Amino acid sequence: MSTYLRGLKEKAMAELQAQPSIDGKEKPKFMALQQVYEWRRALKDLIPNDRPILSNCVGFVVTLIPAEDLLQKPLSYVASQIRHTLIEQGSREQIEAYTSLIRQDPINRAPPLFGDTSMKLLMFTNWQRARLYETDFSAASVNKLDGPLFPSYIQAVPGPYEFNDGLILFGKDSSGNYWFGGQRAQGQWGMMERKIEEGMKDF
């Protein structure tokens, strides 16, 4: 395991160092695109199939990409880089290496952050496949119901870190509405709302 982790570190450092300065210019700034990834498929032999289990089984995959590429190259390029990351970091060996880093944090058991201190971290997560709004809570209802009882609102409480930039797609409710959540640095949420409104003009 330590050999594998060492190899990943050496590869990451080599890729960062492979961006030389040209004519005295600074090296390009990188962005860290972090997304939630489900581990159940890779770890299915560890999850009992003969009884219920209620537990998170997710981690993060991180795509390091030059900010210049993020701004200037087509969205399809960014998507291909993220797809490559999902394949590479979704392997059983990679997941075991990742969780070994989590266990090194005895207090929070928090996932590690990758990159350097100059990076901008952007977090995105799509929970639609979890079908949270299709969870039936009728068994917990005080009054007897004739049909299912679905949630009307879902809220995420991040921790142990307080991130200042992230978006969550919670999913689609029973009325067909899509719910988003997120956090931005203080004073920047107004700009976020304007951008969302601009993007929704054609819908």
Can you describe what each PLM-predicted range is?
Residues 1-203:
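Acyl-CoA-dependent O-acyltransferases
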